[in-house]
Amino acid sequence: MGQATSNIDPQEKRDIVQEFTKEELQTLFYHRCLSLLKPIEVAFLKQDLNGKTSVTADDLGKLFKFPENTNSFSEGTLNILYHVMKLIGKFPFINNNNLAIEETLSFEELVVSLVFFSGRYKKIFNSDYDFLKLLFISLSDRPQTKDSKTIDEKNVDPGTEKFKTNLIVALEEEDKQELRARKINWSKLDVIKDFDHTEVQQLSVNAKRLQDMTTLCLILNAIVRHNHDAIQKQLVEYSDRWREFEVYSLYLLRYLDVYLELDKLENQKISYDSFSKGINGLLPYFFQINLNRMVCDSLLSSNSPMATKPTEEHNDSTESTPQKKHTFPKFQETKVVSIPFLSYVSSMLQGIGNPTILSPSNLVKLYAGSEAGFSIRSLETKIFKWQAPTLVVVSGKRLKSKTMQTNRRYQKFDEMYPRHFLASENHLRDWQHESDRITYAVLVNQPWKSSNKNNFGDEKSIILSISPRADYFKSVHSSILQGQSIYFNNLGMGLGFGNNQPLNKNDTKRFIPGDMSLTIEANLEFAVFRHLVNSSSSNDKFFHNSQQSHISHEDYEDRFTISTIEVWGLLVSGKELEEQKKQWEWEEKQAEARQNVNIRNLGEERAFLEMAGLVGNHGAAGGSM
C-alpha cells in the first residue's frame, strides 16, 4: 500500500562535509590554482626563477620585466606589489599578521597570486566573488601582531584547528592532491565568504600607496599589444613618463575622495566605503584588467593573444597594390592630448560602459586652437568635414575673482550668461581652488553641423571632467529630447553642450544653460561648466548629474579662461571609414590648391579668406594665452 515519507532534508542529503586543517586547506588551494596554469607556463615560470623557491621584491620586478635603472618603478612601488601578492598568496587565510616578518614570496604564494591577478580564480568561485575587496584588504594598513586574535581567544593551536568544508564529490583515499582540490566547493567555505573574518570597515588604504598602484595600471593600460618586443619597448618608454601618468592617477582617485591633495597623499587615508563606491562607480574592472595584462605580458604570455606576422604581411601586400590608399596623419601628442591622457580617458570610458576606444591608432587631430587660431570660423572649417564621432577637449585656468571684476571681455560674457550664485557668495566649494587647471572633454557621436536654430546630437554624447578630478555626465534618456544637447552657433553664441538654444535676436543675446552643461563663448576665450541639482529652473536637462558621493547633491560651477581647445576625430570602421577617407583626401586636394594661390596680392579677397578662417590672422581673436 502506501510508503512512508522521508524526513531527510534533500539539501542535507546532498551536502558532503569534511574537516581540514589550515595547512591542508592552503596546500589544496595551491594545487587548485596550479591546475589552472598550463604545463608550459609552469615550466617557463620555474625557468625564470632559476631554481629559486622564493622571490624578493626586486626579483618580482625582473619577473614582470619592469625596466631597470629607472626612477619610475621605484622600490616603493615594487614593495607595494610584493605586499599585495604576499597577502593574496596566503589565500584563503588572508587575515595574516606575520607578513612584515617574511621577506620573500614562496613559489606557492606566487602561483596563487598570479591566478588572482590573471582572473583565473573565476574558475574556482562563483561569478560574484569580490576581487576588489580582496585587493583593498591586500593594500590596507593593518596592525602587525604575531598571532591572530581569533585563535588566541579560542586557545586553539593553529596547526590543529579544523575547518568544515563542503565537497562536491566525496574524496577517495587514492585521490591525488589536484583531484582532491577540485572536489572542494571553495565558494561555500566560510573563511572565503567572510575574507577570513576580516573587519573590512575598520581598514583603510594609504592614498599614496593606492596612487602608485593606479599609476602602474595606467601605464599597463597605455600599452598597445602587438608582440613581446613592442610591449617591452612601450613599457620602458612609458615608465620614464611615470610622473605624467601619476598626475592622472590622482585625478582618478579624486573620484573616491575629492579632498585628496598631491602634497598630503602620504598622510591621507581612503576608507573601504570610499574605495568601494568610487572604484565600482568609475573603474570597476580597471585593476583586474591591467593586473591581468601585467601577468600575461610577462609570466603567462603563452596564454595572451598576440598580434602576429600576418598583420605585417597584410601591410606589405597593400604597398604592392598599384592603387594608392589614403592614410590619415600619424598621431602626434599635444600639450593636452598625450599617451597618459588617452590611457586615463579610455579607462574612464571603459569603466562607465562606453564602448568608445581611444588610442593613437584611431585618432586624427582636426583642430587645435594653438595652430589654427582661436576662431569659431576656423573651428568650423576644420571639424565640419568629419563625418564620424569626435572628442572635444577644452582646458584652461580657473577664473580668479580679480579677473571677473576687471576683465571687460569676461564681463560682457557674464552679462549674457545668467547667474545662479549671488555676486556676494563664495562661488568656490571647499574642494575647489583658484589655482586649479580645468579640463573638460565631450564625446560627440554625431557629425558637426551649424545649428543656429535647433540642437543636434544623440544620447551617446557624454561630458567628462578631466582635471582637477575625474567625473562623468551621461546623456539623459528621453523620448522627447532624444539627446539633442549640442549646438554650434556661428552667429556669436559659440558652442553649447547640455544647453537650450541661446536667445540671439533684436540686439539681445542670452545663454540658456542647462543644469548640467558646458558652455563655450564665441571667441573661444571663456567657458563654464555648470552642475546644479537644487535648481528650480524649467530648463531641459540633457545630462545626468555627478554620481560622485561628495558632489552628487552639490551645486557648483567651473568658470575658466581657455588656453587650449582641440577637436579630435575618431576613426570608425567599415563603410563610414571609407567615406571619411574619400572626404579627407578631397579636403587635402583643396588645401593644396589653395596653397598654390598667391595670396599676397589678393587684396580684398585675402581679407575675405581671413574672415573665413582659411588663411592668416588666426591668432588675432579668442583664446586666453
Swiss-Prot record:
Its main location: cytoplasm. It comes from the Eukaryota. GO terms for cellular component: cytoplasm. Residues 335-571 form the TLDc domain. Keywords: Cytoplasm. It is found in: Cytoplasm. Residues 305-327 are annotated as: Disordered. Belongs to the RTC5 family. This is Restriction of telomere capping protein 5. It comes from Candida tropicalis (strain ATCC MYA-3404 / T1) (Yeast).
